[in-house]
Amino acid sequence: MLSQTLLEMTEQMIEVAEKGADRYQEGKNSNHSYDFFETIKPAVEENDELAARWAEGALELIKVRRPKYVHKEQIEAVKDNFLELVLQSYVHHIHKKRFKDITESVLYTLHAVKDEIAREDSR
Protein backbone atom coordinates (compact mmCIF):
# COMPACT_ATOMS: atom_id res chain seq x y z
CA MET A 1 0.00 0.00 0.00
CA LEU A 2 2.80 2.42 0.94
CA SER A 3 4.57 1.95 -2.37
CA GLN A 4 1.37 2.34 -4.42
CA THR A 5 0.45 5.63 -2.77
CA LEU A 6 4.05 6.84 -3.02
CA LEU A 7 4.13 5.82 -6.67
CA GLU A 8 0.96 7.82 -7.37
CA MET A 9 2.33 10.89 -5.59
CA THR A 10 5.66 10.55 -7.42
CA GLU A 11 3.91 10.37 -10.78
CA GLN A 12 1.76 13.37 -9.85
CA MET A 13 4.87 15.38 -8.90
CA ILE A 14 6.57 14.43 -12.17
CA GLU A 15 3.52 15.67 -14.07
CA VAL A 16 3.42 18.94 -12.08
CA ALA A 17 7.16 19.50 -12.64
CA GLU A 18 6.88 18.89 -16.38
CA LYS A 19 3.86 21.20 -16.67
CA GLY A 20 5.73 23.79 -14.62
CA ALA A 21 8.68 23.64 -17.00
CA ASP A 22 6.33 24.16 -19.95
CA ARG A 23 4.55 27.03 -18.17
CA TYR A 24 7.88 28.69 -17.35
CA GLN A 25 9.03 28.50 -20.96
CA GLU A 26 5.72 29.80 -22.31
CA GLY A 27 5.67 32.60 -19.73
CA LYS A 28 9.25 33.61 -20.49
CA ASN A 29 8.49 33.73 -24.21
CA SER A 30 5.17 35.59 -23.94
CA ASN A 31 5.93 37.62 -20.79
CA HIS A 32 2.62 36.37 -19.35
CA SER A 33 1.95 37.15 -15.69
CA TYR A 34 -0.35 35.39 -13.23
CA ASP A 35 -2.44 36.76 -10.37
CA PHE A 36 -0.77 35.92 -7.07
CA PHE A 37 -3.85 35.29 -4.94
CA GLU A 38 -5.96 33.71 -7.66
CA THR A 39 -3.41 31.40 -9.28
CA ILE A 40 0.04 31.28 -7.70
CA LYS A 41 -0.78 30.99 -3.98
CA PRO A 42 -3.33 28.15 -4.39
CA ALA A 43 -0.96 26.22 -6.67
CA VAL A 44 1.95 26.54 -4.24
CA GLU A 45 -0.20 25.59 -1.24
CA GLU A 46 -1.66 22.56 -3.00
CA ASN A 47 1.76 21.36 -4.10
CA ASP A 48 3.29 22.11 -0.68
CA GLU A 49 0.90 19.56 0.82
CA LEU A 50 1.71 17.06 -1.95
CA ALA A 51 5.47 17.55 -1.49
CA ALA A 52 5.20 17.13 2.29
CA ARG A 53 3.22 13.88 2.00
CA TRP A 54 5.57 12.62 -0.74
CA ALA A 55 8.68 13.40 1.32
CA GLU A 56 7.21 11.59 4.32
CA GLY A 57 6.50 8.51 2.19
CA ALA A 58 9.85 8.64 0.42
CA LEU A 59 11.74 8.91 3.72
CA GLU A 60 9.80 5.89 4.99
CA LEU A 61 10.75 4.02 1.80
CA ILE A 62 14.42 4.83 2.43
CA LYS A 63 14.18 3.71 6.05
CA VAL A 64 12.49 0.41 5.17
CA ARG A 65 14.24 -0.56 1.91
CA ARG A 66 17.58 1.27 2.18
CA PRO A 67 17.91 1.85 -1.59
CA LYS A 68 21.36 2.20 -3.07
CA TYR A 69 20.74 5.31 -5.19
CA VAL A 70 18.18 7.36 -3.23
CA HIS A 71 19.15 9.15 -0.02
CA LYS A 72 17.50 11.30 2.65
CA GLU A 73 19.30 14.47 1.52
CA GLN A 74 17.96 14.06 -2.02
CA ILE A 75 14.40 13.74 -0.75
CA GLU A 76 14.71 16.90 1.35
CA ALA A 77 16.25 18.78 -1.59
CA VAL A 78 13.47 17.64 -3.94
CA LYS A 79 10.81 18.82 -1.52
CA ASP A 80 12.31 22.32 -1.41
CA ASN A 81 13.27 22.52 -5.08
CA PHE A 82 9.88 21.21 -6.20
CA LEU A 83 8.13 24.10 -4.46
CA GLU A 84 10.66 26.55 -5.91
CA LEU A 85 9.97 25.09 -9.36
CA VAL A 86 6.20 25.50 -8.94
CA LEU A 87 6.54 29.10 -7.75
CA GLN A 88 9.07 30.15 -10.39
CA SER A 89 7.06 28.53 -13.16
CA TYR A 90 4.49 31.28 -12.56
CA VAL A 91 6.67 34.32 -11.80
CA HIS A 92 9.67 33.81 -14.13
CA HIS A 93 12.10 35.72 -11.85
CA ILE A 94 14.79 33.09 -12.06
CA HIS A 95 17.41 32.68 -14.76
CA LYS A 96 16.59 30.08 -17.38
CA LYS A 97 19.67 27.96 -16.58
CA ARG A 98 18.89 27.91 -12.85
CA PHE A 99 15.29 26.92 -13.53
CA LYS A 100 16.44 24.18 -15.89
CA ASP A 101 18.92 22.87 -13.29
CA ILE A 102 16.25 22.77 -10.58
CA THR A 103 13.79 21.04 -12.90
CA GLU A 104 16.31 18.41 -14.01
CA SER A 105 17.39 17.76 -10.41
CA VAL A 106 13.81 17.32 -9.22
CA LEU A 107 12.87 15.06 -12.14
CA TYR A 108 16.02 12.95 -11.76
CA THR A 109 15.28 12.16 -8.12
CA LEU A 110 11.56 11.63 -8.72
CA HIS A 111 12.36 9.15 -11.49
CA ALA A 112 14.92 7.44 -9.21
CA VAL A 113 12.25 7.01 -6.52
CA LYS A 114 9.76 5.75 -9.12
CA ASP A 115 12.34 3.23 -10.40
CA GLU A 116 13.09 2.09 -6.85
CA ILE A 117 9.39 1.48 -6.18
CA ALA A 118 9.04 -0.46 -9.44
CA ARG A 119 12.18 -2.49 -8.70
CA GLU A 120 10.99 -3.49 -5.24
CA ASP A 121 7.41 -4.16 -6.33
CA SER A 122 8.56 -6.45 -9.16
CA ARG A 123 10.38 -8.77 -6.75
Swiss-Prot record:
InterPro entries assigned to the protein according to its UniProt record, in alphabetical order: YppE-like (IPR014913), YppE-like_sf (IPR023351)
Cross-referenced SUPFAM superfamilies: YppE-like (SSF140415)
Gene3D superfamilies per the UniProt record, alphabetical: YppE-like (1.20.120.440)
Pfam families assigned to the protein according to its UniProt record, in alphabetical order: DUF1798
Protein name (database record): Uncharacterized protein YppE
Organism, scientific name: Bacillus subtilis (strain 168)
Gene: yppE
